[in-house]
């Protein structure tokens, strides 16, 4: 049997910070449950909680960034070539997205269609594409330059193998300085996460940024 337990409400996610009304409703439900069980209950103070939660939510908004590098053909590239190049680097197609996983099977990086429509396995062999995008969700990968350098190594290999240009969201060709700035930006945002004991790529980060 149990002498007691804790009931919790996730108040911070990619949907934003829970409203005070949600906290009030949750507290009332907990009290009703405790009453039915003939148990005592201690509910956290909503004002004190919000004083902590609001700056935490602001930090999460600030660090919740996905870096996109687009690999674009000046004409077109066949789906067969894209698939072969990605699979040669251990990417696997799953639900319309090519995923790159670590040795434990955890998703690290992904490649998506340039127009955001899913890659369809049956159509890849016969379809031509303008290109694809490589995505780096800095909240979901281990912290540090090493992981970003691994990502960029894959990007450069794919670009070289397929003869594709590397461009940003405005289709401007990437410069060496841009890449240095992005690397620094990633490290700074991940350091912010670590400063509040949220390890990028951890179970807590997965839950917060869901």
Q: Predicted segment positions?
A:
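Extended, low-complexity intrinsically disordered regions enriched in serine/proline/glycine/threonine
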Residues: 1-5, 13, 28, 32
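Short, solvent-exposed secondary-structure capping/transition elements
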Residues: 16-21, 42-43, 79-80
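Membrane-proximal, solvent-exposed terminal domains/tails of membrane-associated proteins
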Residues: 60-68, 72-77, 81-210
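Intrinsically disordered, low-complexity linker/loop segments enriched in Gly/Pro
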Residues: 39-47
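Conserved glycine-bearing catalytic or ligand-binding loops at nucleotide- and phosphate-handling centers
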Residues: 17-26, 30-33, 37
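Short hinge/gating elements
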Residues: 9-16, 136-141
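A short mid-domain helix/strand-loop element embedded in enzyme catalytic domains
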Residues: 46-64
């Amino acid at each position: 049997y149990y002498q007691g337990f804790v009931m919790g409400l996730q108040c911070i996610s990619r949907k934003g910070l829970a409203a005070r009304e949600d906290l009030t409703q949750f507290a009332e439900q907990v009290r009703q449950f405790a009453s039915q069980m003939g148990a005592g209950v201690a509910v956290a103070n909503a004002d004190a909680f919000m004083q902590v939660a609001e700056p935490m939510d602001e930090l999460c908004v600030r660090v919740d960034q996905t870096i996109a590098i687009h690999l674009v053909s000046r004409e077109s590239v066949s789906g067969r070539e894209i698939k072969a190049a990605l699979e040669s680097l251990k990417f696997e197609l799953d639900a319309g997205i090519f995923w790159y996983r670590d040795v434990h099977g955890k998703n690290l990086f992904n490649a998506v269609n340039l127009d955001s429509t899913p890659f369809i396995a049956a159509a890849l062999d016969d379809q031509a594409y303008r290109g694809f995008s490589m995505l780096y969700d800095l909240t979901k990968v281990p912290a540090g330059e090493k992981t970003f350098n691994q990502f960029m190594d894959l990007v450069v290999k794919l670009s070289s193998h397929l003869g594709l240009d590397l461009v940003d969201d405005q289709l401007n060709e990437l410069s060496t300085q841009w890449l240095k700035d992005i690397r620094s930006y990633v490290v700074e945002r991940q350091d912010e996460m670590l400063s509040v004991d949220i390890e990028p790529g951890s179970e807590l980060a997965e839950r917060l940024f869901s």
